[in-house]
């Protein structure tokens, strides 16, 4: 486990919030401003994400977002696991 990252600071500096849950899960609630690309489509749609900004991935509990971070880092993105979307939303928006 690396050093604790301040996700709020990263997001305030313009990071992209990537929600890798299914479109149905995303429709039921998500972090304001998040982009939804389900994990099983990330490889095909990764170019939709800007490479010049950090990406904070989230999902329901942190498992899928962890996989997404591995994919993103392998493609040269600066990526962070934001964990579950509801706790990330609380961290960012109070």
Q: How should each PLM-predicted stretch be described?
A:
Residues 2-16, 23-54, 63-94:
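Rhodanese-like catalytic fold shared by cysteine-dependent sulfurtransferases
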Residues 58:
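Short, surface-exposed ligand- or partner-binding patches at beta-edge/loop junctions that are enriched
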């Amino acid at each position: 486990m690396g050093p604790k990252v301040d996700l709020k600071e990263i997001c305030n500096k313009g990071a992209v919030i990537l929600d890798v849950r299914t479109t149905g899960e995303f429709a039921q609630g998500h972090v304001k401003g998040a982009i939804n690309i389900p994990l099983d489509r990330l490889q095909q749609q990764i170019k939709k994400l800007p490479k010049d900004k950090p990406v904070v991935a989230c999902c329901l509990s942190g498992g899928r977002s962890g996989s997404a971070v591995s994919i993103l880092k392998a493609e040269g993105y600066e990526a962070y696991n934001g964990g579950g979307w509801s706790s990330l939303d609380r961290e960012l928006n109070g």
